[in-house]
A protein has these predicted regions:
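Charged catalytic cores and adjacent phosphate/nucleic-acid-binding surfaces used
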Residues: 1-4, 11-12, 17, 28-29, ...
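Divalent metal-binding segments
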Residues: 21-33
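Internal active-site segments that recognize and position negatively charged phosphoryl groups
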Residues: 34-44
Length: 145
């Protein structure tokens, strides 16, 4: 539990459901976990979640630059790319598995960047992890910029 250094790492705020400031987080939240990628994904899945590696193409901390490939058999529903690359280019350049959906998010680190890149899903039924996973598996999604 190292203390955060706001002067070099930036502030870490805790907000409530309405987005209102609650407090500053004093502990540094940038430290890595002592899990392998496979262990992490397995735990997320076991808890009913859905692991989607984020901005896999980004030079800093992206899955492809860090590992050089997507591990075969990694039980994820999708791979997320940054707004800097087209899905078709990412698929070809990084030899992404055909069975995995490639989605895009805004990778927002600032409030005004939220929604700058969007993947729309065609869901059947209620909003749930299972229905999102099914839509991704059945390729019922579209990347919007």
């Amino acid at each position: 539990n190292l203390p955060n250094r706001p002067e070099t790492l930036g502030e870490q705020f805790v907000v409530d459901a309405a987005g209102d400031f609650v407090r500053r987080e004093e502990r540094m939240l940038l430290l890595s976990a002592q899990l392998t990628l496979e262990e992490l994904v397995t735990q997320v899945n076991a808890l009913g979640g859905m692991a989607i590696p984020a901005h896999i193409d980004r030079p800093e901390n992206g899955l492809i630059p860090l590992l050089g490939f997507v591990p075969p058999g990694l039980p994820v529903a999708a791979l997320e790319i940054s707004p800097n690359i087209a899905a078709s280019v990412a698929r070809a350049k990084f030899h992404l598995p055909d069975h995995l959906a490639v989605v895009r998010g805004s990778d927002a680190h600032w409030l005004d960047a939220i929604g700058s890149a969007v993947t729309e899903l065609e869901l059947e039924g209620t909003r749930s992890v299972a229905n999102v996973a099914r839509a991704l598996r059945e390729k019922r999604y579209a990347i919007q910029n």
